[in-house]
Amino acid sequence: MILLHIETSTNVCSVALSEDTNCLFSTSNAEGMNHAALLSVFIAEALEVLKSADKKLDAVAVSSGPGSYTGLRIGVSTAKGLCYGYGIPLISVSTLEILTVQALNIVTDKENVLFCPMIDARRMEVYAAFYNGKGIIQREIAADIITSDSYAEQLDKQTVYFFGNGSDKLKTTLTHPNARFIDHLVPLAINMIGFAEKAFTEKQFVDTAYFEPFYLKEFHTTAKKTTPNS
């Protein structure tokens, strides 16, 4: 199977092309939210690799967030356009899973350890989930408000590795001895390959027409203003 992978959930724009588990092409740019200009160029480069090998695309995988509204909108709309144009299915991969793959490759001792990818939301808030050392989810994604006591339940029992662009907030607040931080991890398309391949094999496709990514939203609603009686 040949899959095109698109990751645009943060300020990093990333594209990869894979055949089964092998990466045929990978590129990324982390110089800011210039996805609208970069993504089409990166995809054209990937498709040129495909053309030179005289092979056809079987599906497109796109990061589903959580992440930037602008970035995800560009990535998902582009992925949908490709799926319609080629008549192929769409696969979605969680941004938090993409981050966790990288952390699992970095940490050697994974016994009694949790991995917590974090995406920055606003103020002292993040979206986070927990995975064990085998990459199996232990707590589903949730919106968390960061305090000095955050994640005490997990940290009191075991070492927890925090990473992703939301972990900087926690790093300046949390002092628990079991907290570890992996800096500078960003979601990259090349780390979507394993998830996308599994989804394709199991025919776990999303509805191209109706699929919507997990946009970052504000946690709190503003109280409705009341107009005083005149």
What are these regions (language model features)?
Residues M1-S64:
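N-terminal beta-alpha supersecondary unit
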Residues I6-A30, K171, R180, H184, ...:
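Patatin-like phospholipase
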Residues N22, N34, P89-P187, Y215, ...:
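Surface "functional belts" at beta-alpha junctions
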Residues A30-V41, Y69, R73, S77, ...:
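Residues at secondary-structure transition points
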Residues A46-L50, G85, A103, A189-F200:
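Stable alpha-helical structural segments in soluble proteins, enriched in small hydrophobic residues
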Residues A61-T95:
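DPxDG-like acidic metal-binding loop motif
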Residues I182-S230:
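Acyltransferase
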